[in-house]
């Protein structure tokens, strides 16, 4: 079953077209790489998926929920803020330049977002944080500070 379906995405900044008729289908659990030269629109395309950028045409469907679609008149219609919010809470994105809080441990860096964004309590977050850190192979580093980790380890913390 298709999990992410981005069809015929168009994106312009002023009169500059940066995405023209770009499509992507991903199945649940599938690992996909988007490659291309610098400035080719890879990050913009992903920002459109994460609703960090609006689209000027096309459609975006995630897990069966239509986030954006273009009608016959060329107008892009978006899902309600509530629908977008609920779906985006289940998504994550690691940016090319990611930042961890240097004064916080690995575990604290993992726990802060669910605490601040979702209002979760630490006893709810702790088992999830342990599972995520185990998944990226960093549970044993949970009490370390980012400066003590390699760049790759820091990126894995950001992914978790």
What are these regions (language model features)?
Residues 2-160:
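ABC family nucleotide-binding domain
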């Amino acid at each position: 079953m298709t999990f992410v379906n981005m069809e015929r995405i168009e994106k312009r900044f002023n009169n500059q077209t940066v995405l023209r008729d770009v499509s992507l289908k991903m199945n649940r659990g599938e690992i996909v790489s988007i490659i291309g030269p610098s400035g080719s629109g890879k990050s913009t395309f992903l920002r459109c998926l994460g609703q960090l950028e609006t689209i000027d045409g096309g459609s975006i469907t995630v897990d069966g929920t239509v986030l954006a679609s273009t009608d016959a008149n060329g107008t892009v219609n978006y899902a309600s803020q509530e629908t977008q919010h609920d779906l985006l809470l289940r998504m994550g994105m690691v940016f090319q330049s990611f930042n961890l809080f240097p004064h916080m441990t690995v575990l604290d860096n993992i726990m802060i977002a669910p605490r601040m964004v979702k209002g979760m309590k630490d006893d709810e977050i702790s088992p999830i944080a342990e599972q995520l850190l185990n998944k990226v192979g960093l549970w044993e580093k949970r009490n370390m500070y980012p400066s003590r980790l390699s760049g790759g380890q820091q990126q894995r913390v950001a992914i978790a």
